[in-house]
């Protein structure tokens, strides 16, 4: 059975502050195949790494991410003295050594702002000539569609929470309608039947975010293509022992 790809979550959130350059280095050190990052726009339109809509939980700042300039965010402490990095910072550090999966955070009711985020991220990818080692991920199918229409050479994934039965068919249909290549599904609902259904439609299956050997073993048996984990070093070591 083929081994799944090792994909760090929020860079490597269980090994370094989430969405920081320290996390990028942890993924690289672990020999990860890919790394998922969360991307939003600063007030001056620069793609930066941040999971939450607000800064309160993970930095020493407060308020919405989009209310702060890039300079303010880079002066913040995102954990252990790490600044909030820009997407450009991350792409420069990675330089093609792993795939950078950019999860684009949608803003409900603000389609124009979402489009600006898609366009800004793709522009950074273009500037770094990173089309072959970058990908777009989003819970928002419209953002996936815009990304694929704008830059077909960059692969795209629709993210989903738990799905079962007809919900799986609807998810796969939504992906293919938007010319995407993969789904990223919350791990508890993943089973062999779901993966087989996706494979029949030539859809890649990622899963998030299991951190235990028991779950990794189950997901490998199910046939997933990649595991998004907070602990890429541990997953890499586990796969090396199999």
Go through each PLM region and give its residues.
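Phosphate-group recognition and catalysis centered on beta-loop-alpha active-site segments
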Residues: 1-242
């Amino acid at each position: 059975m083929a081994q799944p790809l090792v994909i760090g979550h929020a860079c490597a959130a269980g090994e370094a502050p989430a969405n920081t350059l320290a996390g990028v280095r942890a993924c690289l050190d672990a020999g990860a195949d890919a790394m998922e990052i969360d991307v939003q726009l600063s007030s001056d339109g620069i793609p930066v790494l941040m999971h939450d809509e607000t800064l309160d939980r993970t930095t020493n700042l407060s308020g919405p991410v989009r209310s702060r300039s890039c300079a303010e965010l880079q002066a913040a402490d995102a954990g252990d003295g790490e600044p909030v990095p820009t997407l450009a910072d991350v792409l420069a550090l990675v330089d093609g050594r792993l795939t950078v999966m950019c999860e684009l955070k949608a803003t409900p009711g603000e389609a124009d702002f979402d489009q600006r985020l898609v366009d800004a991220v793709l522009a950074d990818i273009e500037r770094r000539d990173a089309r072959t080692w970058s990908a777009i991920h989003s819970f928002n199918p419209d953002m996936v569609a815009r990304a694929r229409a704008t830059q077909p050479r960059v692969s795209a994934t629709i993210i989903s929470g738990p799905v079962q039965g007809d919900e799986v068919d609807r998810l796969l249909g939504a992906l293919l309608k938007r010319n995407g290549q993969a789904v990223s599904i919350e791990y508890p609902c993943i089973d062999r039947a779901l993966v087989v259904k996706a494979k029949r439609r030539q859809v890649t299956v990622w899963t998030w975010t299991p951190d235990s050997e028991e779950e990794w073993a189950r997901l490998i048996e199910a046939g997933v293509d990649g595991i998004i984990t907070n602990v890429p070093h541990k997953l890499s070591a586990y796969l090396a022992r199999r």
